[in-house]
């Protein structure tokens, strides 16, 4: 896939890196999660405005890594209730920590909320890499 080829390319530029993360927005979050399932070196993820109402995320059983799911409560493309259903399913899995952030008033495109989105993602990364939210180097469930 294109995502796997992109990851291979990035890893070729940084051969000494011991880990990596994946992030995706909308359909890209589904692609990123597919990649997460196939690549054991991926230690975490950020899924922005995933669309479980459109794309099947049932392959995330079990989800091998902890991560952030962030979305807006005014998203009409990926309704909050559908994203909540995905988060609820992931919360039942052992060995991972799923952090959910719901941005009040934010739509699917985060119009007028892009700075808040960036701040929330940066805060999550800082806290996660400091070991506050989940083990910074989790053991994968494989």
Label the model's feature ranges.
Residues 106-118:
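Catalytic histidine-centered segment of alpha/beta-hydrolase-like enzymes
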Residues 63, 68-71, 75:
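Short beta-strand/loop motif that positions the catalytic acidic residue
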Residues 65, 79-89:
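Short alpha-helix in the alpha/beta-hydrolase fold that links the catalytic acid
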Residues 73-78, 108-109:
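Acidic catalytic loop of the alpha/beta-hydrolase fold
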Residues 90-109:
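Catalytic histidine neighborhood in serine/cysteine hydrolases
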Residues 1-14:
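Alpha/beta-hydrolase active-site loop
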Residues 14-25:
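Alpha/beta-hydrolase fold nucleophile elbow
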Residues 24-32:
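Gly/Ala-rich beta-loop-alpha elbow adjacent to hydrolase catalytic centers
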């Amino acid at each position: 896939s294109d995502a796997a080829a992109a990851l291979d390319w990035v890893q070729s530029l940084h051969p000494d890196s011991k880990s990596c993360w994946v992030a995706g927005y909308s359909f890209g979050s589904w692609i990123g999660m597919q990649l997460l399932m196939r690549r054991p070196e991926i230690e975490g993820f950020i899924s922005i405005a995933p669309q479980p109402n459109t794309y099947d995320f049932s392959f995330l059983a079990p989800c091998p890594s902890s991560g952030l799911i962030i979305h807006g409560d005014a998203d009409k493309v990926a309704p909050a209730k559908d994203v909540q259903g995905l988060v609820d399913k992931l919360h039942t899995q052992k060995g991972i920590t799923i952090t959910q952030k719901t941005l009040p008033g934010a739509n699917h495109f985060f119009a007028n909320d892009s700075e808040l989105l960036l701040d929330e993602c940066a805060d999550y990364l800082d806290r996660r890499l400091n070991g506050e939210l989940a083990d910074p180097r989790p053991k994968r469930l494989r």
